[in-house]
């Protein structure tokens, strides 16, 4: 098993409310848990409005499977509707160190 980090950076659409977005992102948890591969998730935003969604997955396959299905899942629609699509960048990376 190779723990995989999924790092997605993006901006919200103009006028999108950060609190509403964070709630919509939290409402995706059942879907993410259903995948069976999510370990943990952190969502942050910097002072310039760049958001980072950082999810640890049990494997690269689990990460890619979830990424492929998230756009069609009804639980993800409110969250995805607030993201400026062209600003989004996703990458996956092998985790070499994890400290709690």
Predicted regions and their residues:
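Short, surface-exposed ligand-recognition loops at beta-strand->loop->(often short) alpha-helix junctions
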Residues: 11-23
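Short coil/turn motifs at secondary-structure junctions
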Residues: 13-15, 46, 58-62
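Active-site-flanking beta-strand signature of metal-NTP-handling nucleotidyl enzymes
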Residues: 3-11, 52
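A generic structural micro-feature
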Residues: 2, 45-47, 84
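Short, solvent-exposed polar/charged micro-motifs at secondary-structure junctions
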Residues: 51-54, 99-100
């Amino acid at each position: 098993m190779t723990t995989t980090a999924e790092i997605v950076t993006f901006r919200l659409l103009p006028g999108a409310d950060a609190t509403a977005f964070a709630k919509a992102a939290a409402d995706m948890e059942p879907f993410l848990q259903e995948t069976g591969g999510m370990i943990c998730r952190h969502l942050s935003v910097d002072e310039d409005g760049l958001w980072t969604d950082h999810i640890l997955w049990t494997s690269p396959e689990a990460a890619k499977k979830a990424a492929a299905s998230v756009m069609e899942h009804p639980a993800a629609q409110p969250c995805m509707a607030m993201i400026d699509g062209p600003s989004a960048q996703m990458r996956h990376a092998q985790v070499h160190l994890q400290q709690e």
